[in-house]
């Protein structure tokens, strides 16, 4: 179990950087564009697995996002029933849109979403990121009308490895996206969890003690994240 947890964390980290190693040992996939990402097996394999999830309507507390979500061991950190993790390493806003039907099928009680850092990494235009995120929120409200929706801000980073983007450039884009999300959540009457400043140290860096590599969270980061949202899961 411990080995599986470590292996899964390593896979999530590599996936978030645009590197997928099947079984973490053999087949290596690298992508630098959105189109390339959807050609590697990782996304379809996860969706196939998610299709098998079954639950009574209005019982599941669902987390959906990219590698930061996928690496979140919900049962270990939150220690409660009916938790579902639909994180996929490397995923982007368009990927979330493609698989919202899986969320609709489950009709969760609560939905926690965090997505966007990979869109920024792949240099997808901000206008498109915002448009697709707005579609995600609107679609969730229509397809899961009884669910409580929590849009979590994109977290700070310490630059993004494998790109030419400085931390200043990344931080500017993340702040712009978070500002849009905050306004969008007010307009659409859904919850916005502004986690960014809680994870931030001076100059928009992700706090060193919360990360392995400057973008993905370590156990301490997940423990801290859990503390911020636990009260929202227990009511």
Regions flagged by a language model, labelled:
Residues 34-37, 80-93, 121, 214:
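Acidic/histidine-rich helix-loop elements
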Residues 63, 83-85, 192:
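Conserved beta-strand scaffold positions in the cores of enzyme catalytic domains, especially
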Residues 46-49, 92-98:
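N-terminal post-signal-peptidase region of extra-cytosolic proteins
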Residues 64, 70-82, 94-131, 150, ...:
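Oxyanion-hole/transition-state-stabilizing segment in secreted/luminal serine hydrolases
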Residues 144-148:
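A short helix->loop->beta-strand "cap" motif at the edges of active sites that frequently abuts
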């Amino acid at each position: 179990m411990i080995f599986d947890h470590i292996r899964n964390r390593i896979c999530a980290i590599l996936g978030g950087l645009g590197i997928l190693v099947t079984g973490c040992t053999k087949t290596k996939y690298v992508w630098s564009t959105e189109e390339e990402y959807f050609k590697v097996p990782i996304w379809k394999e996860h969706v196939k697995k998610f299709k098998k999830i079954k639950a009574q309507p209005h019982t599941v507390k669902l987390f959906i996002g990219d590698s930061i979500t996928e690496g979140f061991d919900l049962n270990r950190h939150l220690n409660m029933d009916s938790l579902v993790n639909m994180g996929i390493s490397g995923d982007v806003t368009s990927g979330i849109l493609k698989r919202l039907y899986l969320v609709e099928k489950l009709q969760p009680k609560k939905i926690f979403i965090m997505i966007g850092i990979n869109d920024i990494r792949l240099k997808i235009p901000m206008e498109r990121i915002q448009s697709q995120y707005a579609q995600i929120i609107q679609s969730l409200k229509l397809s899961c009308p009884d669910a409580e929706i929590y849009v979590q801000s994109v977290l700070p980073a310490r630059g993004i490895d494998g790109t030419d983007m400085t931390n200043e450039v990344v931080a500017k884009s993340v702040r712009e996206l978070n500002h849009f999300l905050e306004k969008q959540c007010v307009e659409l009457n859904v919850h916005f969890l502004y986690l960014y400043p809680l994870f931030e140290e001076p100059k928009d860096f992700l706090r060193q003690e919360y990360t392995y590599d400057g973008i993905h969270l370590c156990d301490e980061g997940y423990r801290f994240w859990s503390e911020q949202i636990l009260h929202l899961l227990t009511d």
